[in-house]
Amino acid sequence: MSDVVVIHTDGGCRPNPGPGGWGAVLRQRHHVREMCGGEPAQTSNNRMELTAPIMALEALTRPVSVHLYTDSTYVRNGITKWVLGWERNGWMTAAKQPVKNADLWRRLQSACARHEVEWFWVKGHSGVADNELADVLATRGLQEALAASVV
């Protein structure tokens, strides 16, 4: 796998829980793709933070090396530290409770399986250009979802 694809993602809700949006910026050499979407019904920040990398990875047309940046420690820690244990334990936490958002964790695992994904955490709202753009896209996704839901 060559030609690393760099992805920045973000997601959020207003209020949380409430309607939400997600955004992603994908870069490979000189190519840039911006993606966004949203959920006009009740969702959560964590579901939107998970949806963003899922949608970005699923949009890739062939297996590649990916550097994926998120400002969500929940997503980064979940996929790099916790998910294999949850899977081993039948999608139960150490406290024997069902894993929240297990449907999205499974989907993220599947999306990652096609690629070599290296995960990075970036501090949100700290001036990292593509993280800021992903935030703008997440807001756009929320706004578009809300606008579509009233028609």
Swiss-Prot record:
| Binding positions (Mg(2+) 2) | D10, D135
Q: What class of enzyme is it?
A: hydrolase
Free-text comment on the cofactor: Binds 1 Mg(2+) ion per subunit. May bind a second metal ion at a regulatory site, or after substrate binding.
The record's GO CC annotations read: cytoplasm
**What are the UniProt keywords, alphabetically?**
Cytoplasm, Endonuclease, Hydrolase, Magnesium, Metal-binding, Nuclease
Which cofactors does it use? Mg(2+)
TM helices/strands, residue ranges: none
Instruction: Kindly state which reaction or reactions the protein catalyses.
Output: Endonucleolytic cleavage to 5'-phosphomonoester
Q: Which residues form the RNase H type-1 domain?
A: 1-143
> Could you say which residues form the signal peptide?
none
Molecular function terms from GO: magnesium ion binding; nucleic acid binding; RNA-DNA hybrid ribonuclease activity
Enzyme Commission number(s) from the entry: 3.1.26.4
Choose any GO biological process term that the UniProt entry carries and state it.
DNA replication, removal of RNA primer
Q: Which domain of life is it from?
A: Bacteria
Q: Read off the PANTHER family from this record.
A: RIBONUCLEASE H1
Q: How does it assemble?
A: Monomer.
* The name this protein goes by in its record: Ribonuclease H
**Source organism of this protein record:** Mycolicibacterium gilvum (strain PYR-GCK) (Mycobacterium gilvum (strain PYR-GCK))
